[in-house]
C-alpha cells in the first residue's frame, strides 16, 4: 500500500465565518500569502485565482494558498496567456486581455486584504446596503476596471490602507513589483504597531498574532475529529 501524508487544512471561509478580523490578523494573512507567492515566483508560476475561497488555514493558524487548477508557468512571452480567474479579484490588464505577469497575483491579494478590512466588501460596493445585487457588483467591477481609485478600506489604519491600495493599483507599474516587497511593507507596519481603523475591533496583544477564541475552538474540534 502507498500512503500519502498531507497537511490537514481547512477553508479560510469556513473558519472565519462571522468573525471580524483585526489589522494584525489580516496582516498575518497577507504576510503568509506573500511568502506563498514568493515560492511560486521561484517556480515561475502565476496562481491567477487568488480569492478567499482559495485560502486555507492550518491547525496552527498559518494561512496557505491552494487550488492551483488554473495556475500557469511564466514564459518568456506573455502574449499567449489567457483570461482566467475570478472577475471580482482580477487585475485590469488580465481583464482587458493584455499581456500580464505575476503582478496580477499581487493585485488579487491586495483586493483580498481590502475586502477583509472593508466590512467584507470589495471596492465601490455600498457599505450600508445589507443585500448586494448582481447590478451592484457589475457597477463596482466597471468602476474598478475604468481606473477609478478605490476609497481606503474603512477598517484599516492609514498606513495599512496605503499598503493595500498600492498592492491593488490600477497600473501594474505602481504596485509592489514582487511579493517580497509587498511582504516587507506589511512587516514594517506590523513592527511599528499599526493604528487600528475606526471600525476595527481590538483583540490580542504583544507582537505576535493572537487568533480569535472562536477560531481556536473550531480548529481544536476539527483536529480532534480528524485524528479520531
Which residues make up each language-model segment?
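Conserved short submotifs of the Hanks-type protein kinase catalytic core
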Residues: 1-12
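Activation segment signature within eukaryotic-like protein kinase domains
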Residues: 29-30
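Conserved activation segment of eukaryotic-like protein kinases, specifically the C-terminal portion
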Residues: 80-93
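Protein kinase catalytic-loop region centered on the HRD/HxD motif
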Residues: 35-45
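Conserved catalytic-loop aspartate of Hanks-type protein kinases
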Residues: 105
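Conserved HRD-motif arginine in the catalytic loop of eukaryotic-like protein kinases
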Residues: 175
Amino acid at each position: 500500500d502507498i500512503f500519502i501524508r498531507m497537511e490537514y487544512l481547512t477553508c479560510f471561509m469556513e473558519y472565519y465565518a462571522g468573525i471580524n478580523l483585526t489589522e494584525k490578523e489580516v496582516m498575518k494573512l497577507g504576510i503568509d500569502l506573500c511568502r506563498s507567492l514568493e515560492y511560486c515566483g521561484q517556480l515561475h508560476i502565476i496562481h491567477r485565482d487568488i480569492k478567499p475561497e482559495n485560502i486555507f488555514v492550518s491547525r496552527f493558524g498559518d494561512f496557505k494558498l491552494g487550488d492551483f487548477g488554473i495556475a500557469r508557468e511564466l514564459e518568456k512571452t506573455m502574449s499567449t496567456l489567457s483570461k482566467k480567474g475570478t472577475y471580482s479579484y482580477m487585475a485590469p490588464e488580465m481583464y482587458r486581455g493584455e499581456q500580464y505577469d505575476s503582478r496580477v497575483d499581487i493585485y488579487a491579494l491586495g483586493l483580498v486584504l481590502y475586502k477583509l478590512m472593508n466590512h467584507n466588501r470589495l471596492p465601490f460596493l455600498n457599505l450600508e446596503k445589507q443585500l448586494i445585487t448582481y447590478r451592484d457588483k457589475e457597477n463596482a467591477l466597471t468602476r474598478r476596471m475604468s481606473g477609478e481609485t478605490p476609497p481606503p478600506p474603512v477598517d484599516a489604519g492609514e498606513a495599512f490602507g496605503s499598503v493595500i491600495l498600492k498592492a491593488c493599483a490600477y497600473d501594474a507599474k505602481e504596485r509592489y513589483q514582487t511579493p517580497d516587497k509587498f511582504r516587507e511593507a506589511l512587516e514594517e507596519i506590523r513592527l511599528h504597531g499599526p493604528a487600528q481603523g475606526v471600525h476595527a475591533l481590538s483583540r490580542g496583544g504583544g507582537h505576535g498574532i493572537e487568533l480569535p477564541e472562536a477560531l481556536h475552538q473550531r480548529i481544536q474540534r476539527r483536529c480532534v475529529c480528524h485524528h479520531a
